[in-house]
């Protein structure tokens, strides 16, 4: 796989190679999600195995450590890589487990902290709601000539909020939907509203 690195078509070529391998092992993709595979119990693996891949990082889920170890061994025979053992962070999300309750949930505290630092919001005072109830964002607040600095910063903030909404913060979805209406012509009012969501 080393020759794939650096080529513009590398991710696609790697995905096709991984997909062919997983399908040869009895896996199939889940619906329209082409980077998540599931293998039903049976044969050399007596329980369901789920694999999620992001470029060359794989997250493997199954019930028993024995089955997972066997699958990891088989996978690492085919693809050169390392076994990072228990996952703590994946795609900017930390996995928090309660072994006694047999539960797990995702948080993005680290990602959120990086976003706050990137936009100099680390010392901001928290607010009770992401958007002020009296704020009405409007096209009337759009400038006739967009300041490139405001435009770039606004798009960056809204992009970061989008990732939070999609992963762990659906409570920010309304704010995100309102802010995303003004990606082409944000003004100072829109930028202030975006900063408030980060607070």
Predicted regions and their residues:
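Long, low-complexity, charge-biased intrinsically disordered regions
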Residues: 1-199
